[in-house]
């Protein structure tokens, strides 16, 4: 065992004692970030190249700082995104919704589909769609100035073809010039009710921006209600919406769409763990 792998083993034990959910993966990712290699390349780092900053990173993770804030990067589908304090860290669960969105775009008989991402955060969803559906034109909306800076940086670095346009605006008022023309609206809005505050992991509630977590209203679904109204305004007849929610809110979000006139094919869809994760709906064509 080389020095770095030995130190990773020690760090894993420390992070496990601190209550980290995935201590080995965290230790490896911290080591990879410090040494600027992939996790699969850690075994090749020579003893002479060991960087003692690794232990500074481990101490920060022990104290509850999010892994992605320490490393400054988050992985989402095929992207490596720049993240940090003030922007929501994208989660793997959201990747399933993006996969559905891409399949839906492929099935549309539209040459250059128009997509809107409401509450883009780091621009993970917007960039994934733009890069994996190269003909898509994507408008990403973010109201928080700090998150907007992160999104701008990621778009400038990754969107070489200029398919994503970023807008600093609120969900409700966004993009009136596109009313009735959009093919697909996607959103991972805030949806946690404040009554769940004590159950949210500290490294989430103390570090992710509040506006990206707490959805408003007793059920946490007020932001999703705004997304539904905005999607109904933006979409063309026959266009689709996809909105993420927690695994306990599927029924509530289903009825937000099903009870409104104009929506068809409302469905709750599951993530890779077979839990309710996002609702999709089609705006009626008549």
Predicted regions located by residue number:
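Conserved SAM/SAH cofactor-binding pocket of Class I
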Residues: 96-199, 226, 258
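Flexible, glycine-/basic-rich loop-and-beta segments that form/coincide
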Residues: 285-286
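Conserved AdoMet
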Residues: 29-104
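Conserved beta-strand segments of alpha/beta enzyme cores
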Residues: 80, 137, 163-165, 264-267
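Non-catalytic accessory regions of SAM-dependent methyltransferases
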Residues: 1-42
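Residue-level signal for inorganic ion chemistry
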Residues: 30, 64, 94, 125, ...
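Conserved Class I SAM-dependent methyltransferase catalytic core
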Residues: 217-282
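Mobile active-site "lid"/loop adjacent to the S-adenosyl-L-methionine
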Residues: 191-223
């Amino acid at each position: 065992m080389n020095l770095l792998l030995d130190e990773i083993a020690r760090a894993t034990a420390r992070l496990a004692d601190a209550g980290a959910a995935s201590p080995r993966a965290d230790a490896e990712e911290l080591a990879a970030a410090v040494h600027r290699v992939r996790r699969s390349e850690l075994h090749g780092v020579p003893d002479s190249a060991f960087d003692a900053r690794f232990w500074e990173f481990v101490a920060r993770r022990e104290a509850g700082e999010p892994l992605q804030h320490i490393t400054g990067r988050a992985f989402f589908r095929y992207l490596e995104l720049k993240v940090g304090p003030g922007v929501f860290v994208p989660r793997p669960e959201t990747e399933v919704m993006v996969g559905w969105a891409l399949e839906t775009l492929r099935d549309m008989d539209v040459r250059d589909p128009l997509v809107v991402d409401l509450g883009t955060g780091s621009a993970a969803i917007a960039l994934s769609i733009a890069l994996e559906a190269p003909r898509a034109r994507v408008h990403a909306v973010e109201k928080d100035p700090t998150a907007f800076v992160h999104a701008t940086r990621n778009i400038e670095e990754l969107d070489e073809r200029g398919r994503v346009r970023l807008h600093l605006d609120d969900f409700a008022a966004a993009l009136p010039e596109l009313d009735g023309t959009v093919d697909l609206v996607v959103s991972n809005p805030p949806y946690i009710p404040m009554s769940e505050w004590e159950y949210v992991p500290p490294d989430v509630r103390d570090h992710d921006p509040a506006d990206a977590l707490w959805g408003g209203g007793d059920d946490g679904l007020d932001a999703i209600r705004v997304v539904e109204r905005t999607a109904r305004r933006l979409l063309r007849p026959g266009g689709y919406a996809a909105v993420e929610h927690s695994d306990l809110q599927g029924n509530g979000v289903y009825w937000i769409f099903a009870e409104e006139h104009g929506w068809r094919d409302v469905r709750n869809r599951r993530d890779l763990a077979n839990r309710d994760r996002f609702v999709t709906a089609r705006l009626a064509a008549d």
